Amino acid sequence: MLSLALPCRSWAHRLPAALKFGLLAVAMIALMRIGSLAGQGAAVLVVAALTASLGRKAIRQSLVTLRPLVWIVAVILIWDSLQGAVAQGVLFGLRVLAMVGLANAVTLTTPLPEIVALIERLAQPLARFGISPRIPAISVALVIRFVPVLRARHDTLAEAWRARSARKPRGKLLAPLTFSLLDDADHMADALRARGGLALPRKGRDTVGT
């Protein structure tokens, strides 16, 4: 399974995954409690500086991640402006940019196996109720991994459509995209079954899938 983490090593890569996600949770709570434009603006600058300290590749990847979000924030800002709540819209936009930027920085500096291992450790109490801790761990890993895969697959299909037609595809890419993802899901299910599935690990065996 591929990871979204940057291949280069930075100071943030050396931090334990538990520490990074713990600090991320605290930062998210703090951002929700900041109610001033100056405070949220300062938070965005701090997140930008943090991302810049990770290197040029981190900056480029963060910009790619935030690009679709800018349009969503712009639409919300326009709506709030029409409602006479410009300050509220700006505050919301800054908060979202800071949160997503910070979460993206953690994702870029934490290899996927470390994320899976962390979630599996946190989910160990579920084993008392007969629920395998691997289920939430693998579920989160699949979501993180397949979101960019879905976007890349859509871009590939759209490029193939443009090579054959000058018309916009509109919803005509939905069927081939769905079938290709279902095929990937079948292969993923076979791979999971070959590695023991998601059942509770037996005693004496390693509980962290790699």
UniProtKB/Swiss-Prot annotation:
Changing R164E: Approximately 3X reduction in BioMNY ATPase activity. Loss of BioMNY complex assembly. The keyword Transmembrane applies. One of its GO terms (cellular component) is plasma membrane. Pfam families: CbiQ (PF02361). Residues 32-33, 93-98 are extracellular. It is found in: Cell inner membrane. It is a multi-pass membrane protein. The chain crosses the membrane at residues 11-31, 34-54, 72-92, 99-119. Probably involved in biotin uptake, although complementation experiments in E.coli do not indicate a clear role. This is Energy-coupling factor transporter transmembrane protein BioN.
